[in-house]
Structure formats: C-alpha cells, structure tokens
Amino acid sequence: MDISNVLPASSLFLGIVPALIILYFTLKGYEEYFKDKKIFLSFVAGLLAGFFSIIFESFVRNFGVISLIILIPFFEQIVKTSILNSRLARGTEGAPIYGATLGLGFGSILTPFSIAIYASKWSGLEIVGLSIVTLGAIGFIFFHGATGIYIGYGVKSDRVWRYFIYAVLFQIPLMVVSLVSDEYNLEFLQVLIVVYSIILYWYAAKKVLIMTLPKSKRRKIVKE
C-alpha cells in the first residue's frame, strides 16, 4: 500500500500531536509554576528552531560522518540554549518547564522531514516502513524534550554551559545509532533510539524537573 500521497500534510501532525500529549502529562502538577503565554511561545520557538536545524543539517551532510556526529548535536543544543538563556526563561522558576516545551516543539518538527527523507530513498512509504520511521521520530521528540529540561535546569541554576555540554554528549550516541540505521538500512535500530530517549526523558521529568522547586513544593508534586 503506497500512502505517500496522503502524508505530506498529515505527517506534521504525527510529530506535533505526540509532542503535545507528552507536554500535557509533563505539565500536570506544575500549573502554578509557568505562564501559558510562555508555554505557547516556547513551543512555537521550538518548531522554528527545529526547522532551521533541519536546514543546517542539510548543509553539513556533505562534510562527513564525524561532522554530522559532532556538529549537529552542538548546533541543535546551542540553539536551544540560546533561546532558553534569553528573557524567555532566564530568571524564572519555570525555566526547565519552558525547556521541556521548547524541546518537544523542536523534536516534533523532525517527524515530517524524517518521513520525507525515507520517501525520497524508497520512492514511497509502506505501512511497516512508516511505522518504524515514525517510531524513531517520536524517540527524538522525547530526546529533545529531555535535553530541554536539562538545559532549562542549567539556566535556572546558573550552570547553563555545564548542562549544555551534557545535552551535547547525550546526543552523540543517538546520532551514531541514527546514522548507522540510515546508512545500512537497519530500521530496527530505531527501537534503540526510542528506548534511550524515553529513559532519558523519564529521568529528566521525574528527577531533574522537580529539583527546580522548593522542597515543600516537591513533596506536593510527588503526591499528585
């Protein structure tokens, strides 16, 4: 079944909808610690930053494997760091929350482009191939949400560059697996991306995000 004709417009929702669902559950219990306007701005900023990241990646793809493994993580994380270290989040209690929102928006825009790349290689999309590619793309949504939390925590705690470095280091193994999967058509490796990213997001959401709050408020969040 060739479904490539119905995907161009709808594929965007394959990224945005999961990102919004993840964001909804992440924000539960934190309602008094963020502003709705900044949540909206953070998500839109993530979408735009993700789009420009894809353009950047298209330029560096010809520079070799090492460039992809190093330059892309550096560029993507420095973009998120620059946004979060601005007036959007700096000096706010909810910086890690805005980081999660920014990262989820950033990751969501990668889904349609992942599908487009797959379609260009295989001149069409089959259900199984689409499912695998979408699964891997959702993994990147979790990943960028997690690194957004880490960077946001760095902004909150005035250790922004330390957590920026952590985010870059976290992304390098993800890039290696992604490139191997793409180069040798080992789509099943996308499962590793998802597992790695979900674990990273779970830890960031449960252990790092909550550390931004006073101890009394942390206990309240845990109970909820």
Indicate where each model-derived feature is located.
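Hydrophobic alpha-helical segments at protein termini of multi-pass membrane proteins
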Residues: 1-224
